[in-house]
Amino acid sequence: LALALTLAVTFTVSASAMAQTAAPLSAKDSNPETMGWMQGFPPSADKTIRFTDPDFFTFPKLRWTVCHFRQLMPNVGVSKGSAGARPLAVALDPALDSVSFTPLGADTTMTWDEAFAANYTDGIIVLHHGRVVYERYDGCLKPDSLHAVMSVTKSIAGLLGEMLVAEGKLDDAALAGSLIPELKDSAFGDATVRQVMDMTTALAYSEDADLRTYSMAGSPLPKPKDYTGPRSYFEYLQTVKKGGTHGEAFATKPSMPTPWAGWSRAAAVNRWPSSSPSA
């Protein structure tokens, strides 16, 4: 399920990038292997992708990047613990490929099989009653490889939060500022944990106007010599001002909830990473 959601987000980013060109490459033609990204040693200059490239997260390079963040920037693997993975029962249903539907805003139908390529899907898995009924991969993704989860991180953090609430380890009626004292003077200070989890906080934050500062705070790249802003997402959260009354309306801030969620979950169980990462 998480993988399916991940790929929906990946397509959204790709579509935005592709809208900039008159005739975008098809899913088949933009396949990273077909494009030849990072193949051979050393890869040719015109097929090399670096984190410092201004277009590393732009289509068609994006289709390679989303599976190779560990080669591009610092990150940390999260252990699944000593118990190991629990195998899922498999009962694949080939008939799903012929299921048809009418996309939003369209006049004609398409099949599930046709939608896979139309959405530039890298991979998808469908679970029904605990069984894998559909699983398919393309592009950079393989059954044993990694893929950026993007905003699915919010779903994972939200699920962990609800588990802690159910276990009595996280009080969703508590003020965020009491759970994390560093945030008491920020917009989060007088918001309840539940309001933050439900995205009903009133934040003076715009994904257009403020995203650059937010991204600069968490970027692993060196800051300019004259930079005086926050140097991590956690520092950035402390600068966010209130922009209304908490709890009155749902307002998704795509970049904002996840760093807070990670910080609050760690505070609730008093378990912290060995160092304070920026992301």
Positions of predicted regions on the chain:
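Catalytic-site signature segments of enzymes, centered on catalytic residues
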Residues: 135-137, 143-144, 208-210, 218-279
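N-terminal leader/targeting segments and the immediately adjacent pre-domain N-terminus
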Residues: 17-141, 198, 202
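Bacterial N-terminal signal peptides
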Residues: 2-14
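Active-site SXXK
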Residues: 130, 147-172, 196, 260-264
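Solvent-exposed, polar/charged alpha-helical surfaces in well-ordered, non-transmembrane soluble domains
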Residues: 110, 114, 158-159, 174, ...
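Active-site helix/loop module of the DD-peptidase/beta-lactamase fold
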Residues: 143, 152, 166-208, 239, ...
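Aromatic- and histidine-enriched alpha-helix N-cap/loop-to-helix transition segments
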Residues: 119, 150-156, 188-191, 251-258
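Extended ligand-binding groove/face enriched in aromatic
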Residues: 120-121, 148, 183-237
